Amino acid sequence: DRQCEYVRAIAFALLGEDESKAAAATLNQMVIENGCHLNTGFLSTPFLCDVLAKYGYADTAYKLLLQPDAPGWLYEVGKGATTVWETWTGIDENGKPHESLNHYSYGAICGWLFGGVCGIRYTDGALTIAPTPDKSLDWAKATYDSPAGRIVSGWRYNGDAVAYEFGIPANLTVDVTLPDGRKLTLAPGKHTV
């Protein structure tokens, strides 16, 4: 079994809901047993954290996001990266690159930063926001210049409390779902919750 097989089956809706829940539980366990490292490729990596978070494993998704060792996004940052590399270990021990140091593939995590961590989902003119804050990250904020205008979603921890900020463009209302179950409908403008 590989993580990618489970990610694709869930993300591409190839399973029923009960099967997806069971597959997500197995996927979560696989990631944990792999030291919270991913072993997915180009097709599955963009969906991994989203699938985990959707089925109640956001804590594991955050551990993947913040993994300091290879394979992991922060490994590159720890080595001085200012771009996303083509491979997880894009430089050798002497700092010499052996592949592209500016490559789109693993940058796919940005989709989850916008759509999961900050919760911005804008599809066919409809906007929903459902942020997924986690204490392992003190704060997050995303700004998306959509066809409807600028959308902002952010959150910040203050102790155990989370403060949210939202910016909604003109002529658009948005349904916001907070992790505690609160549902809000926000009109255009800036909002703090």
Predicted regions and their residues:
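Conserved active-site and cofactor/substrate-binding residues in soluble primary-metabolism enzymes
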Residues: C4, L43, G56, Y104, ...
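Non-catalytic C-terminal accessory modules of carbohydrate-active enzymes
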Residues: D59-V193
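Amphipathic alpha-helical protein-interaction segments enriched in hydrophobic
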Residues: N39-V51, V174
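Extended glycan-interaction surfaces of carbohydrate-active proteins
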Residues: D1-L43, K63, Q67-A70, L74, ...
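Well-ordered alpha-helical scaffold segments within catalytic/enzyme domains
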Residues: V7-D18, F47-Y55, G115-G119
